[in-house]
């Protein structure tokens, strides 16, 4: 019998713990980047600059672009997995958020703001964890794939 790569495997206890951990981290990333995205995308630069001085020193378009990317990542890290429609987007969104944080490290260090580096590393690591977990270890099966397995009698 030929098996599909997407065929469900037996769920182990460690997989359940990992799935739970991934959902918690996904929620943390969604809240954090959702808030950051709204601030960077919608709050006037003059009001944002006292709390995020870098926003006054770069193009407003860049601040808005970063905000839009953070918002897209916040939605993408949870919604596709939650509704199981194109869940492959979840690890991609997590990787994108990790990339934003990774690029922010040298930017802030070059501005003499190394104190934010630990936080940036933590959020980059959380993004990498979700990208790894949802793409390699315990990916979420899309509704379409699950329906196909049911029709084929493999579930």
Language-model-detected regions and their locations in the chain:
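Membrane-interface extramembranous regions
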Residues: 2-155
